[in-house]
Amino acid sequence: GPSIFTLKHLEKLAASDYNGAIFTSDGILIDALKHGVTPEKFSNYYCLSVDGNSEKIWKWYDDRLVDQYANKIKFILNSTVAHNVYQRIKEVGGEAYWFNAMMDYWPGQESITRVMSASLRGPRRPNGLVRIATAGNCGASLWIQACSIFRRFTICLIGLDMGYPDGMPLEQTYYYDKLFKAVQGNMEFVKA
């Protein structure tokens, strides 16, 4: 979120003597690298992607710094991530690790998560992918995965604003255009 810039968290992290793991969301990856939060300084470096929108997410990977550092970053990818992003990560030497975001109560017979998990089984993964509650955004998903998968319990969260800044017009939010189209311009329905 915006606090990562207003509070200069990236600059502080880059200048620190912190020697633990870095878990970054895809949306902040390029900025983190530009500010010196790189896998050269922090050797356990992870980047998570959950978004399946191939147009919006691409810009977070289309940079020379991603080219330079991808082979030192472990990319944690949701099974629904945009295919062009996965191709890009492979192209620049990044290592991909997969998970399946839980969409609903997965043991239920009509569960979307259950169907997705079944479709992801194969000879290499007879049980499918690990299922993880993601809380609907990269930051919260990273927090959950840092604890539950990577067993990191001392965590400093930066830039996890859990929403948009106060006063931000709805029209400037990230998926406004898609929402506007989905409700056929009837934004009163959304504001209610």
Question: PLM ranges: what are they?
Answer:
Residues G1-A192:
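Metal-ion/cofactor- or nucleotide/acyl-coenzyme-handling active-site neighborhoods
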